[in-house]
Amino acid sequence: GKHNISQEVEKIHTFISIHGKMFLRTNNETAANGMFLLNKDSTKIEIEYALKSLIQRCESFHNTRKATNIVGVKFISSESGSGFQDLYRVHVLFGKILSYYAVTSHLDIFHNIDMGGNDLDRFIELNRDLCERMSKIKQNVLKAAKVLNCNLGAVEFFIQNNELIFLELNPMWGGHASKFGFGNDKMQAYLKKNRNQLIKLIPNIYIFMDRRTYYKDLFQWIHYYCSTNL
């Protein structure tokens, strides 16, 4: 139907005035595609541009993905006041956790490749902490995939006040981390060079990067699950 653009722009403008910062985005894309970060400095013209761009984007997807829609979500700042944005990802397959990791950056919107030397200490600290808390959060993460009726995917979340704030379920593979490793070239080189010391602190990172063993375990689990459940 016809969109009342000016009315929607007003609603978005009010939302920003309450929350300070927000993402306006499509509901079913990954890798920061179809996403605008708006804040109190965003003019109504900029808000209108973002909204019209997303409406056009949704219309182009409707033939193949009818459920495509636009959502507005409050931007969640890092709780520590560290200036870092921390993001957690857990790979789930048939009710089992295969792997998990945390990434971090000073940027509001970032990809794995954006991590560098300045992020290294925090990257190690977050992943060490994630390894320690995994047994406590495991059931919640598995439940998040289950309620979406998905048996395969990467559950993404923030952690605030020791609570998980779920963001989305992503495809598991094809990203920079699964192809090349974590961070930029300098960070990858550091992780390789210091493997013997770091593997004791952040075994999850090296398990994920050991592709031959990782995929062997993955396919063995698929075979076992299908043999016993189907």
What is each PLM-predicted segment?
Residues 33, 39-132, 136:
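Phosphate-binding site of ATP-dependent enzymes
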Residues 1-35:
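A conserved helix-loop-beta module that forms one wall/lid of the active-site cleft
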Residues 118, 128-132, 146, 150, ...:
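C-terminal active-site "lid" helix and adjoining low-complexity regulatory extension at the edge
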Residues 27, 75-76, 91, 156-158, ...:
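Anionic group-transfer/hydrolysis microenvironments
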Residues 29, 95, 160-162:
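Short strand-connecting beta-turns/loops that link adjacent beta-strands
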Residues 141-145:
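A conserved acidic, glycine/proline-rich C-terminal tail/linker
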